[in-house]
């Protein structure tokens, strides 16, 4: 066994390139902070020539998957309450491919989500919106996504869901913007008062 990494901080989720010559992995240098973005690293399979390929990308990277030719990786990230699927080339260029990656549980759909990539680059992923639980969507040739299932039609024909609104607040401490979500009750009437939970 040979140790390939030694930075002060975690290194994890290693993925070997299709030709076996490179290793992509996630990690970060531990600066003893509450949160630090997961960074995408690349090195030779010998452990040499370690580089950061996501250096200019200001979001935490998860779920890395090599493309079939070894020219880049697919991954997921969260941005402003929305989980996304993206592609990063080995020179660090990021291309967003899909929004609304979501989980398969009704109670907490934002907590997960998954995708799969075929050798030809076709992507299938769990697509979720506040107004419906997850469905499957497909992306071909890195173009726009298309829903391919309607699994929740029966459920939604018998339920009325509350409308979800994105709201932003300004911090009184440092002026930063803070994102929030307001879900109004089903059959909401603006002339009535409702408890805030």
Where are these regions (language model features)?
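Residue-level detector of Asp-centered blade-edge/turn motifs that repeat once per structural unit
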Residues: 18-19, 68-69, 117-120
């Amino acid at each position: 066994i040979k140790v390939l990494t030694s930075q002060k901080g975690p290194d994890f989720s290693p993925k070997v390139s299709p030709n076996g010559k490179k290793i992509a992995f996630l990690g970060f240098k531990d600066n003893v902070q509450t949160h630090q973005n997961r960074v995408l690293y690349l090195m030779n399979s010998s452990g040499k020539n370690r580089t950061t390929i996501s250096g200019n990308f200001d979001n935490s990277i998860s779920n890395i998957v090599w493309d079939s030719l070894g020219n880049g990786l697919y991954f997921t990230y969260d941005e402003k309450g929305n989980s996304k699927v993206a592609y990063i080339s080995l020179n660090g260029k990021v291309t967003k491919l899909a929004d609304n990656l979501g989980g398969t549980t009704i109670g907490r759909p934002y907590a997960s989500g998954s995708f799969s990539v075929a050798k030809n680059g076709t992507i299938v992923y769990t697509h979720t919106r506040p107004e419906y639980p997850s469905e499957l969507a497909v992306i071909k040739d890195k173009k726009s996504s298309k829903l391919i299932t309607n699994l929740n039609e029966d459920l939604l024909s018998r339920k009325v869901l509350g409308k979800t609104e994105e709201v932003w607040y300004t911090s009184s401490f440092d002026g930063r913007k803070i994102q929030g979500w307001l879900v109004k009750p089903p059959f909401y009437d603006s002339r009535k008062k409702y408890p805030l939970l």
